[in-house]
């Protein structure tokens, strides 16, 4: 972590604080991107969650062909969002 040491010296901030704030910023950016992608998928299908997406499949209101990629992507993104939130809580 030479970069952290150099930058903390230049900015005259505590190395640990710079590291912590850098991680928070990274996680917030990752969370924003994740939420943006979730928004795009949920808007596309007029749903609010992967559970709602699954209900559309069960009711036959949506075809699996051409949509399953979005379903699995949304499922992954929702799980990732929760992990990021948990990581951010640990840094508070």
Task: List each model region and its residues.
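Short, charge-rich amphipathic alpha-helices with coiled-coil/heptad character
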Residues: 1-24
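Short acidic DE-rich linear segments
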Residues: 2-5, 86-92
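Exposed alpha-helical structural elements
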Residues: 6, 17-18, 40, 52, ...
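Amphipathic alpha-helical coiled-coil segments and their boundaries
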Residues: 13, 20, 27, 34, ...
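Amphipathic alpha-helical coiled-coil segments
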Residues: 20, 24-34, 38-41, 74-84, ...
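Residue-level signal for short amphipathic helical patches enriched in basic/charged
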Residues: 29, 48, 91
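Short E/K-rich amphipathic alpha-helical oligomerization segments
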Residues: 42-64
